[in-house]
Amino acid sequence: MTCCAGCGSAARPARMAWRSGRCARTGRLRAGLRKAPMALTLGANHSGKSMYQRNLIKGLAQLPVALVGIDCKRGVEQAAFAPRLSALVTTPDDAASLLGVLVAEMEGRFDLLSRHGVSDLWELPAEVRPVPVVVLVDEVAELFLISSKKDEERRERIVTALIRLAQMARAIGIHLEICGQRFGSDLGKGATMLRAQLTGRVVHRVNDKQTAEMGLADVAPDAVPAASLIPMNRPGTAVAADPSGGWSKIRTPETSRDEVVAVCREFAHLIPDLPFLEPFRPRVPAEVPAAGPSMVKPRPLTE
């Protein structure tokens, strides 16, 4: 998440940047995978966090990338965007399987970089360059929480995979966009290690100052008071920061669910052919055609 000209950031390649909000200082804001390849978005209920993710999906859907959804609220947030998703999982068990596949893909892509003697996806020749993958996690706490001892092994696999991806996957074009209400040590082992790798930060209205500190104190401590004072009657307002220490107050434009669904359908042809994601490809509901004029002509009444 970075501001455009006027906020001190350098230009990014257009193919990897998309409009995601409005900067309070310049009126322009763009998020970019190459500038902030791993990101964390925090916010309380009704803070605008879901609207922010909608805008991310709307922008990313128009780019040549694979979109992967992890929505453990049974898909209520992301299932509608299935026409543009290469993969969607809605339970922690399936999330563990999907993340394991992504780690295996990461290792395979590193082998590809090694064979070509380069260190970054974008240094590869275009004809062999893999498609970037963006993983959108709707509520990260659901991946950390366990209800019984038998869930501990699954949690360990999920957390280990997320940390490995966050630490290394930028170079091979796998990116994480993680959302949650809180994200700190109270989630358990591995949470703070993962958070440290998610260098792009966006914090909406939160329920306590500690949550704002979780999201901003390690990258832009001066932004914590601004995030703590976002009022309830300003949903969509947030503070965006990055490791440079710079930050800006932003406002996510209101975007309807139907608008994002329409964009996902329009750009469904951009879904790349990635066999490793095929087992997780969501079922796309048929589009219901709009009702047309009635073909039944009324008959005149006669006595």
Swiss-Prot record:
The UniProt record lists the FtsK domain at 26-213
Query: Is-annotated flag, keyword ATP-binding?
Result: yes
InterPro entries named among the record's database cross-references: FtsK/SpoIIIE/SftA (IPR050206), FtsK_dom (IPR002543), P-loop_NTPase (IPR027417)
Alphabetical UniProt keywords: ATP-binding, Nucleotide-binding, Plasmid
* One MF term in the entry's GO annotations: ATP binding
Pfam families registered for this protein in UniProt: FtsK_SpoIIIE
Q: Which residues cross the membrane?
A: none
**Sites where the protein binds ATP:** G43, A44, N45, H46, S47, G48, K49, S50
Q: What does this protein do?
A: Involved in sporulation inhibition and pock formation.
The protein's name in its UniProt record:
Sporulation regulatory protein
In its UniProt entry, the species of origin is given as Streptomyces azureus
Lineage runs: Bacteria, Bacillati, Actinomycetota, Actinomycetes, Kitasatosporales
